[in-house]
């Protein structure tokens, strides 16, 4: 975890500050416990997102079931609803971050929504495996105790009849 924190700190405190681009943005997750360590020292446009806090981008509502997420998001004061086949609260958080990035790049809300609806997720991260048996099968390459705990909590929250872990 320390290497992850140090890599993020380097990204925000070094690379972003030394970028020659005029429109530089730091997009930070207020739900991360160490977020204040990543706030750039020099003035850079800094935007925040959160699953629950009133920030630049946050969830107004989230309905999660085995078929995916139905989200109502507020991004820079604009509210929109979107449905995605991805599951897991971490995906809702990633969608907020991506939506904020889209806003900074002046991408239309409609285009952002259509992009989210077409997302299939990252291979190996609660990836749905299609089959003709009507069984919900997911693959996740969680290899740390915390990652495995998060995957199991997500799947248990969806109330499957039976959960088999291989």
Model-identified regions with their sequence ranges:
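Acidic, Mg2+-coordinating active-site environments of NTP-dependent enzymes
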Residues: 1-137, 160-161
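Short, glycine/acidic-enriched loop or turn micro-motifs at the edges of active sites
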Residues: 32, 143-144
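Loop/helix-junction capping segments adjacent to catalytic residues or to phosphate/diphosphate-binding pockets
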Residues: 92, 145-146
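Active-site beta-alpha connecting loops in nucleotide-dependent enzymes
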Residues: 122-124, 146-166
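Switch II (G3) loop of P-loop NTPases
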Residues: 137-143
């Amino acid at each position: 975890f320390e290497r992850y924190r140090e890599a993020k700190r380097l990204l925000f405190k070094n690379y972003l500050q030394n970028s020659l681009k005029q429109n530089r943005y730091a997009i930070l997750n207020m739900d991360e416990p160490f977020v204040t360590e990543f706030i750039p020292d020099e003035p850079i446009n800094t935007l925040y997102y959160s699953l629950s806090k009133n920030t630049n981008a946050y969830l107004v509502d989230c309905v999660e079931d085995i078929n995916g997420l139905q989200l109502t998001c507020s991004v820079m004061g604009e509210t929109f609803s979107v449905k995605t086949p991805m599951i897991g609260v971490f995906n809702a958080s990633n969608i907020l971050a991506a939506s904020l990035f889209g806003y900074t790049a002046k991408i239309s809300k409609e285009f952002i929504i259509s992009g989210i609806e077409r997302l299939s997720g990252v291979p190996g991260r609660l990836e749905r495996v299609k089959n003709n048996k009507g069984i919900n099968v997911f693959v996740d390459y969680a290899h740390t105790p915390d990652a495995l705990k998060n995957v199991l909590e997500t799947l248990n929250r969806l109330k499957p009849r039976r959960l088999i872990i291989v």
